[in-house]
Design a protein with these regions (language model features):
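Glycine/proline-rich, positively charged
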Residues: 1-62, 67-70
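Structured C-terminal cap/extension of enzyme domains
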Residues: 49-178
């Protein structure tokens, strides 16, 4: 890739990673222009320091899973959090026009990052933070046909998203593979 960049075939080289230690090594290597890493309002202090490290090394930071793979249901919280890190470019994972409209409105009228917002974020952190599945699907395909991201997050999906689809006969058959 470095050779292709020198020849002008590509302009930038980026890396995507889910492991903080590997991501830190990539930043410190000086070989990459961007880092794509899971980052949202439930990110811990280590993830925030990683984002700051990219800023300090003049490296782009792309926040994947800005809504934690759909587990953060209040877009305002993560939007307000992201605005505290203006060098971070989030990938929101918008799937519907209504979601696009919500983010366009948030961009026009950003919510305050106040004590109320911080309390909502802290509630999400207590429920979701830690080593949990972000739903990226990097673990797929499973040789046994198990939908690993759904299985790993099922208890959260049932509580934090419209649950009816998860209770179908088809989904029950999928979960019986586990």
């Amino acid at each position: 890739l470095l050779e292709a960049q020198k020849k002008g075939w590509i302009r930038f080289i980026g890396i995507t990673n889910h492991r903080r230690t590997v991501a830190e090594q990539a930043v410190l290597s000086g070989k990459y222009d961007t880092l794509q890493f899971p980052f949202s309002s439930i990110s811990d202090e280590g993830d925030i320091k990683l984002a700051e490290l990219t800023r300090d090394h003049d490296m782009g930071f792309i926040a994947m899973k800005g809504l934690a793979g759909g587990l953060i249901v209040n877009a305002k919280t993560t939007f307000a959090f992201m605005k505290q890190h203006p060098w971070v470019v989030p990938i929101w994972g918008i799937q519907r026009e209504s979601e696009l409209n919500e983010f366009l409105e948030l961009e026009k009228n950003p919510p305050a990052y106040d004590d109320e917002m911080k309390a909502l974020i802290e509630k999400d952190r207590k429920e979701l933070a830690g080593n949990f599945c972000h739903g990226c699907g990097y673990c797929l395909p499973c040789p046994a046909g198990i939908p690993i991201p759904n299985a790993a997050r099922m208890s959260l999906l049932l509580r934090r998203s419209p649950y009816q689809g998860w209770l179908s006969e088809e989904m029950n058959a999928e979960m019986m593979k586990v």
